[in-house]
Amino acid sequence: FGKYFDDRGVVLQTENEGVAHFAQKLYRRCGVQGTVISKERPTGPVYEFSVKDPDEVAKMLALFGHTGKEPTLRIRPENFKCQNCMQAFIATAFLCCGTMTDPEKSYNLEFLSTRHYLSQQLEAMLAEHNFHPHRALRKGANTIYIKAADHIEDLLTFMGAGGAAMRIMDQRMYNEMR
């Protein structure tokens, strides 16, 4: 769900410097070296973790069971050894391409991707865990979204963001009491 993942390497962009350095740390644990750089944008800095060195790219592709020449990128279920792997994958996908509205205004969590098959597979993974996702095409991007507050709370908890789930629960109770 990054900017790209192919024989050129991988690029993950985020507004959170800690997320970029965490990606670097995880790849390093797997034996793949990458770099983090900061790019200034009018809206603020964007941090980019990348693996571009050809030797490191080869290691990365082998690690994930890809050649880098696939016509369409797919999620490979065999890469998930346990439930924690699935949870970490979905959480990382959210960090790469997810957004969530302010719960004071509405309840909406989205994953956006230009990759059609990848989006379909993510939707299926979320449905398999009863998060009740929906899919739409918006401005050329595949959007997987969840609108029900209770499903958003469950997904956030599943991804390890229990504090964010509790804030939504608190806001929902506040809204219901008004």
Per-region residue spans from a language model:
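Charge-rich, low-aromatic oligomerization/scaffolding segments with amphipathic character
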Residues: 59-61, 153-162
